Amino acid sequence: LTERHLLPKFDEIAPQAGAWKTLEVEKIPWISYPYEWSFYQLRDAASLTLELQTEALKHSLSLKDASAYNVQFIGSQPIFIDLLSFEKRTPNAPWAGYRQFCMQFLAPLAMASYEPRLGRMPAGWIGGIPLNLAWKLLPWKSFFCAGLQMHIHMHGWAEQKYGDTRKAAPKVRQVKINDKALLELVGSLRRTVDSLRGPSIPGDWTDYYSNTNYSDKASAAKLQIVELAVKKTGGGLLGHDLG
Protein backbone atom coordinates (compact mmCIF):
# COMPACT_ATOMS: atom_id res chain seq x y z
CA LEU A 1 0.00 0.00 0.00
CA THR A 2 2.92 2.36 0.61
CA GLU A 3 4.35 1.50 -2.81
CA ARG A 4 1.01 2.44 -4.35
CA HIS A 5 1.12 5.70 -2.36
CA LEU A 6 -2.11 4.87 -0.54
CA LEU A 7 -0.34 5.00 2.83
CA PRO A 8 2.60 7.23 3.79
CA LYS A 9 6.05 5.67 3.88
CA PHE A 10 7.32 4.85 7.36
CA ASP A 11 10.35 3.43 9.13
CA GLU A 12 10.42 1.44 12.33
CA ILE A 13 12.76 3.12 14.81
CA ALA A 14 13.86 2.32 18.35
CA PRO A 15 10.68 2.10 20.44
CA GLN A 16 10.02 4.83 22.96
CA ALA A 17 9.59 3.91 26.60
CA GLY A 18 6.43 1.88 27.11
CA ALA A 19 5.73 1.59 23.39
CA TRP A 20 5.42 -1.71 21.52
CA LYS A 21 6.63 -0.14 18.29
CA THR A 22 7.56 3.36 17.20
CA LEU A 23 7.19 4.43 13.59
CA GLU A 24 8.66 7.47 11.90
CA VAL A 25 6.18 8.45 9.20
CA GLU A 26 6.67 10.44 6.01
CA LYS A 27 5.79 14.11 6.52
CA ILE A 28 2.90 15.62 4.58
CA PRO A 29 4.02 18.90 2.98
CA TRP A 30 0.64 20.61 3.11
CA ILE A 31 -2.22 20.03 5.55
CA SER A 32 -5.78 20.56 4.32
CA TYR A 33 -9.23 19.77 5.67
CA PRO A 34 -12.26 18.04 4.13
CA TYR A 35 -14.46 21.14 4.26
CA GLU A 36 -11.85 22.94 2.11
CA TRP A 37 -11.74 20.29 -0.60
CA SER A 38 -13.41 20.31 -3.96
CA PHE A 39 -16.13 17.77 -4.72
CA TYR A 40 -13.73 15.50 -6.56
CA GLN A 41 -11.09 15.67 -3.83
CA LEU A 42 -13.68 14.50 -1.31
CA ARG A 43 -14.81 11.77 -3.70
CA ASP A 44 -11.21 10.61 -4.21
CA ALA A 45 -10.70 10.53 -0.43
CA ALA A 46 -13.90 8.48 -0.04
CA SER A 47 -12.77 6.02 -2.71
CA LEU A 48 -9.39 5.65 -1.00
CA THR A 49 -11.02 4.91 2.35
CA LEU A 50 -13.22 2.21 0.80
CA GLU A 51 -10.30 0.72 -1.11
CA LEU A 52 -8.30 0.41 2.11
CA GLN A 53 -11.26 -1.11 3.95
CA THR A 54 -11.58 -3.69 1.16
CA GLU A 55 -7.88 -4.55 1.37
CA ALA A 56 -8.05 -4.70 5.17
CA LEU A 57 -10.95 -7.16 5.10
CA LYS A 58 -8.97 -9.47 2.83
CA HIS A 59 -6.37 -9.74 5.60
CA SER A 60 -8.81 -10.14 8.53
CA LEU A 61 -8.41 -6.47 9.45
CA SER A 62 -10.78 -3.51 9.43
CA LEU A 63 -10.71 0.27 9.73
CA LYS A 64 -12.06 1.15 13.16
CA ASP A 65 -13.24 4.51 11.86
CA ALA A 66 -13.85 6.22 8.53
CA SER A 67 -13.05 9.84 9.28
CA ALA A 68 -12.44 12.14 6.32
CA TYR A 69 -9.70 13.69 8.47
CA ASN A 70 -7.69 10.48 8.09
CA VAL A 71 -6.91 11.55 4.53
CA GLN A 72 -4.50 14.19 3.26
CA PHE A 73 -3.26 15.06 -0.21
CA ILE A 74 0.23 15.02 -1.65
CA GLY A 75 -0.25 16.96 -4.84
CA SER A 76 -3.51 15.62 -6.27
CA GLN A 77 -3.01 12.15 -4.74
CA PRO A 78 -5.05 11.27 -1.62
CA ILE A 79 -3.10 9.44 1.06
CA PHE A 80 -4.40 7.79 4.24
CA ILE A 81 -2.38 9.04 7.20
CA ASP A 82 -3.91 7.28 10.22
CA LEU A 83 -1.99 4.01 10.43
CA LEU A 84 -3.55 3.29 13.82
CA SER A 85 -7.01 3.04 12.24
CA PHE A 86 -6.25 -0.54 11.22
CA GLU A 87 -7.29 -3.18 13.74
CA LYS A 88 -7.97 -6.91 13.82
CA ARG A 89 -11.48 -7.61 12.63
CA THR A 90 -13.79 -9.16 15.20
CA PRO A 91 -15.46 -12.07 13.37
CA ASN A 92 -18.98 -11.21 12.14
CA ALA A 93 -18.87 -7.70 13.62
CA PRO A 94 -20.44 -4.76 11.72
CA TRP A 95 -18.10 -2.11 10.32
CA ALA A 96 -17.65 0.44 13.10
CA GLY A 97 -16.86 3.18 10.57
CA TYR A 98 -19.97 2.74 8.41
CA ARG A 99 -22.08 5.52 9.94
CA GLN A 100 -19.12 7.90 10.04
CA PHE A 101 -18.37 7.22 6.37
CA CYS A 102 -21.95 8.05 5.44
CA MET A 103 -21.88 11.26 7.48
CA GLN A 104 -18.46 12.59 6.45
CA PHE A 105 -18.23 11.33 2.88
CA LEU A 106 -21.44 10.07 1.30
CA ALA A 107 -23.91 12.65 2.63
CA PRO A 108 -21.77 15.71 1.67
CA LEU A 109 -21.08 14.23 -1.78
CA ALA A 110 -24.74 13.43 -2.42
CA MET A 111 -25.92 16.83 -1.25
CA ALA A 112 -23.36 18.71 -3.36
CA SER A 113 -24.15 16.52 -6.37
CA TYR A 114 -27.92 17.06 -6.24
CA GLU A 115 -28.01 20.60 -4.82
CA PRO A 116 -24.75 22.56 -5.24
CA ARG A 117 -25.84 25.21 -2.72
CA LEU A 118 -25.54 22.56 0.00
CA GLY A 119 -21.91 21.93 -0.89
CA ARG A 120 -20.60 24.15 1.91
CA MET A 121 -22.53 22.40 4.68
CA PRO A 122 -19.55 20.29 5.85
CA ALA A 123 -17.91 23.50 7.12
CA GLY A 124 -20.74 23.81 9.64
CA TRP A 125 -20.77 20.13 10.61
CA ILE A 126 -17.17 19.22 11.39
CA GLY A 127 -18.11 15.77 12.67
CA GLY A 128 -20.20 14.96 9.61
CA ILE A 129 -23.69 15.82 8.40
CA PRO A 130 -26.37 14.07 10.51
CA LEU A 131 -28.09 11.49 8.35
CA ASN A 132 -31.51 12.32 9.78
CA LEU A 133 -30.95 15.80 8.32
CA ALA A 134 -29.27 14.79 5.07
CA TRP A 135 -32.11 12.57 3.87
CA LYS A 136 -34.60 15.42 4.38
CA LEU A 137 -32.50 17.90 2.41
CA LEU A 138 -31.88 15.63 -0.57
CA PRO A 139 -34.43 15.95 -3.42
CA TRP A 140 -36.98 13.18 -3.89
CA LYS A 141 -35.30 11.95 -7.07
CA SER A 142 -32.24 10.88 -5.05
CA PHE A 143 -34.44 8.13 -3.57
CA PHE A 144 -34.30 6.36 -6.93
CA CYS A 145 -30.54 5.86 -6.56
CA ALA A 146 -30.40 2.46 -4.86
CA GLY A 147 -27.22 3.29 -2.95
CA LEU A 148 -28.52 6.60 -1.59
CA GLN A 149 -31.85 4.99 -0.79
CA MET A 150 -30.12 2.45 1.46
CA HIS A 151 -27.14 4.35 2.86
CA ILE A 152 -28.73 7.80 3.31
CA HIS A 153 -32.54 7.70 3.17
CA MET A 154 -33.20 4.46 5.04
CA HIS A 155 -30.17 5.01 7.27
CA GLY A 156 -31.34 8.53 8.13
CA TRP A 157 -34.92 7.41 8.71
CA ALA A 158 -33.75 4.66 11.05
CA GLU A 159 -31.48 7.09 12.88
CA GLN A 160 -34.39 9.45 13.40
CA LYS A 161 -36.69 6.70 14.65
CA TYR A 162 -34.11 5.00 16.84
CA GLY A 163 -32.03 8.08 17.59
CA ASP A 164 -30.97 7.19 21.13
CA THR A 165 -27.64 5.51 20.36
CA ARG A 166 -27.23 4.39 23.99
CA LYS A 167 -30.42 2.35 23.78
CA ALA A 168 -29.56 1.10 20.31
CA ALA A 169 -25.99 0.04 21.19
CA PRO A 170 -26.93 -3.38 22.69
CA LYS A 171 -28.97 -4.22 19.57
CA VAL A 172 -26.12 -3.11 17.29
CA ARG A 173 -23.72 -5.40 19.13
CA GLN A 174 -26.06 -8.30 18.41
CA VAL A 175 -25.90 -7.71 14.64
CA LYS A 176 -23.78 -10.27 12.80
CA ILE A 177 -22.28 -9.64 9.37
CA ASN A 178 -19.82 -12.02 7.75
CA ASP A 179 -16.87 -11.02 5.57
CA LYS A 180 -18.73 -11.63 2.31
CA ALA A 181 -21.68 -9.46 3.33
CA LEU A 182 -19.37 -6.72 4.60
CA LEU A 183 -17.41 -6.71 1.34
CA GLU A 184 -20.73 -6.38 -0.50
CA LEU A 185 -21.64 -3.42 1.72
CA VAL A 186 -18.32 -1.72 0.97
CA GLY A 187 -18.80 -2.49 -2.72
CA SER A 188 -22.24 -0.88 -2.64
CA LEU A 189 -20.74 2.24 -1.07
CA ARG A 190 -18.03 2.34 -3.76
CA ARG A 191 -20.57 2.10 -6.57
CA THR A 192 -22.67 4.83 -4.99
CA VAL A 193 -19.70 7.16 -4.53
CA ASP A 194 -18.50 6.54 -8.09
CA SER A 195 -21.96 7.31 -9.48
CA LEU A 196 -22.04 10.83 -8.03
CA ARG A 197 -20.93 13.74 -10.20
CA GLY A 198 -19.80 17.18 -9.17
CA PRO A 199 -22.10 20.17 -9.57
CA SER A 200 -22.06 21.85 -12.96
CA ILE A 201 -23.39 25.36 -12.54
CA PRO A 202 -22.19 28.71 -13.88
CA GLY A 203 -20.19 30.67 -11.33
CA ASP A 204 -18.16 33.85 -11.07
CA TRP A 205 -15.08 32.10 -12.45
CA THR A 206 -16.72 29.96 -15.13
CA ASP A 207 -15.95 32.33 -18.02
CA TYR A 208 -13.12 34.18 -16.33
CA TYR A 209 -10.62 33.90 -19.16
CA SER A 210 -13.10 34.75 -21.90
CA ASN A 211 -14.52 37.71 -19.98
CA THR A 212 -11.33 39.03 -18.39
CA ASN A 213 -10.21 42.50 -19.37
CA TYR A 214 -6.54 41.49 -19.62
CA SER A 215 -4.97 42.51 -22.92
CA ASP A 216 -2.32 40.28 -24.48
CA LYS A 217 0.31 42.71 -23.24
CA ALA A 218 -1.07 42.70 -19.69
CA SER A 219 -1.25 38.89 -19.64
CA ALA A 220 2.38 38.67 -20.77
CA ALA A 221 3.41 41.12 -18.03
CA LYS A 222 1.55 39.09 -15.40
CA LEU A 223 3.22 35.88 -16.58
CA GLN A 224 6.62 37.58 -16.37
CA ILE A 225 5.96 38.62 -12.75
CA VAL A 226 4.97 35.06 -11.79
CA GLU A 227 8.02 33.56 -13.50
CA LEU A 228 10.29 36.02 -11.69
CA ALA A 229 8.70 35.16 -8.33
CA VAL A 230 9.16 31.42 -8.96
CA LYS A 231 12.84 31.92 -9.80
CA LYS A 232 13.41 33.98 -6.65
CA THR A 233 11.80 31.36 -4.40
CA GLY A 234 13.70 28.45 -5.90
CA GLY A 235 10.84 27.03 -7.94
CA GLY A 236 9.27 24.76 -5.32
CA LEU A 237 6.63 22.19 -6.20
CA LEU A 238 3.91 23.77 -4.07
CA GLY A 239 2.22 27.10 -4.63
CA HIS A 240 -0.68 28.82 -2.89
CA ASP A 241 -2.82 31.57 -4.40
CA LEU A 242 -3.28 34.30 -1.79
CA GLY A 243 -5.53 36.31 -4.11
Model-predicted segments: where are they?
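Glycine- and acidic
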Residues: I31-F39, K171-V175, T206-Y214
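N-terminal auxiliary segments of SAM/dcSAM-dependent transferases
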Residues: P94-G198
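Conserved kinase catalytic-core helix
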Residues: Y40-K64, P108, A112
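Conserved structural core of kinase catalytic domains
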Residues: T2, L6-A45
